[in-house]
Amino acid sequence: MNLGVIFGAKSFEHEISIVSAIVLKNVLKQGLKFIFCDANRDFYLIEQKDMRANFFSSGKYKNSKKLSLAKGGFYTHSLFGANKVECDVIINLIHGMDGEDGKIAALFEFYGVKYIGPRLEASALSYNKELTKFLAQKAGVKALDYEMLTRQSEPKFHYPIILKPARLGSSIGVSVVHDDSELAYAKDVAFEFDKDVLVEPFIKGVKEYNLAGCRIDGKIKFSIVEEPKKKEFLDYEQKYLSFSNENKVKEAEISEELKQKLKFNFSKIYDCGFDGAIIRCDFFVIDDEVYLNEINPNPGSLANYLFEDFESTLNALANSLPKEREIKIDYKFINSITSVKGSGKL
């Protein structure tokens, strides 16, 4: 199977997406087609040998073949016409805006392109942190209390609190606030990236666990459970470095009971429309209860480091994607009206 990877795009997480794509190139043994979307939303076909960070930061990518998106996939163009880039399935590896907000999913659906990634509705629900709270409630999964903050309003929670832009990942614009003296700056940072800011109580020392998975042939394939290294929280630079990880992580040393609880809650989230995607859910465990922290619909490097057999999982998912319902357009209704009217003026 020929797999393609689309990455980059007009997003605050553009550079993290580049790192994710480079990692995927190094992790997967099979050849991949790399499709770069730059900040102007122009598409380029990138050679494997050019998949280096400075190839993009220097602007050299502009010398690559330019692509257009049309029915069935991406195309190069020459004096002799258009040639389709041979990709059976394209992996959506765009982080943040354009990739996780549903834009690229909508384009792929419209043009009939098979892809690995969240569908439009799932993208919208997981991209916006407030909508994710509604999704968790609907799924019967616990989540922390929250409030939405405006520039003029003050948080009602007791300190410490955490401020998060509603539509960003990778810890961009996120701040932990311990007292009034830190609040104004944290608000300025968060509102620089989004007009909507979510506030949650910050629970120091809470247990955190990450679990990824996807549905293959009707059954969810789970990754191992990871317990991330403890810091107050992972900032952008630490997330950037974690996305460049090509090594498998150590499985969390937890009870079988807790492992099953995490899988049960993951399944309830995944069943809310994430078929066709590898997602990662980040959970808190408080007083033996599992709480959803956030959904990563396009996790860094597709969370390859959490799977013992990532390449076979990816290929199996590519063969188990949701199928769009076929709709036959036969114009029977119009023909029946015109035949009755007899004038043909409709």
From Swiss-Prot:
Cell wall formation. Its cofactor is Mg(2+); Mn(2+). ATP binds at residues 159-209. Keywords: ATP-binding, Cell shape, Cell wall biogenesis/degradation, Cytoplasm, Ligase, Magnesium, Manganese, Metal-binding, Nucleotide-binding, Peptidoglycan synthesis. Binds 2 magnesium or manganese ions per subunit. Mg(2+) 2 binds at residues 294, 296. SUPFAM superfamilies: Glutathione synthetase ATP-binding domain-like, PreATP-grasp domain. InterPro entries: ATP-grasp (IPR011761), ATP_grasp_subdomain_1 (IPR013815), D-Ala_lig_Van_CS (IPR000291), D_ala_D_ala (IPR005905), Dala_Dala_lig_C (IPR011095), Dala_Dala_lig_N (IPR011127), PreATP-grasp_dom_sf (IPR016185). Mg(2+) 1 binds at residues 282, 294. It catalyses: 2 D-alanine + ATP = D-alanyl-D-alanine + ADP + phosphate + H(+). It comes from Campylobacter concisus (strain 13826). GO terms for biological process: cell wall organization; peptidoglycan biosynthetic process; regulation of cell shape. Belongs to the D-alanine--D-alanine ligase family. Its main location: cytoplasm. The keyword Nucleotide-binding applies. GO terms for molecular function: ATP binding; D-alanine-D-alanine ligase activity; metal ion binding. One of its GO terms (cellular component) is cytoplasm. It is found in: Cytoplasm. This is D-alanine--D-alanine ligase. Its EC number is 6.3.2.4. Pathway: Cell wall biogenesis; peptidoglycan biosynthesis. Residues 133-326 form the ATP-grasp domain. The keyword Cell wall biogenesis/degradation applies.
